[in-house]
């Protein structure tokens, strides 16, 4: 891996500012001692941590006691992305069959993908990307 033309991102920090003034950052790093995905969402009242290997979600209110919940819905070996791929396909098929609204709308999915593509554009160009202008350029 160190002697090839590997240009896969191994560490990235994305800073975003939304129209309503809310700021968010995303940090992705490949350098961890565990071969799993973890998610940490920090808010004003506490944080939420998810661990795909352990199939747990921990709620930690600031100044309060942490609560850990089992998130093993599809089982520990639920295929790609901790069962997320199966869940996405299940939700998609239900929507196509007319089974109602999904967990996220097509508009929300498009917006999240545009943010990811804009973050990649910013990484490659080394410049900040304004999302509306980026979307118009596509």
Task: Tell where the protein language model's regions lie, with residue ranges.
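Short, P/G- and charge-enriched loop/turn segments at secondary-structure junctions
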Residues: 1-4
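C-terminal helical cap and adjacent loop that interface with cofactors, partners, or active-site loops
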Residues: 8-138
């Amino acid at each position: 891996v160190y002697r090839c033309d590997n240009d896969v991102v191994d560490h990235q920090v994305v800073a975003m500012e939304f129209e309503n003034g809310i700021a968010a950052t995303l940090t992705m790093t490949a350098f961890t001692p565990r071969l799993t995905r973890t998610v940490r969402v920090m808010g004003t009242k506490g944080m939420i941590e998810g661990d795909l290997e352990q199939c747990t979600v921990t709620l930690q209110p600031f100044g309060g006691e942490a609560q850990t919940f089992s998130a093993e819905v599809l089982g520990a070996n639920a295929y790609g992305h901790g069962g997320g791929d199966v869940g996405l396909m299940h939700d998609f098929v239900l929507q196509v069959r007319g089974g109602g609204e999904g967990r996220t709308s097509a508009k929300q999915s498009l917006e999240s993908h545009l943010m990811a593509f804009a973050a990649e554009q910013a990484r490659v160009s080394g410049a900040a990307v304004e999302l509306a202008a980026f979307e118009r350029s596509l």
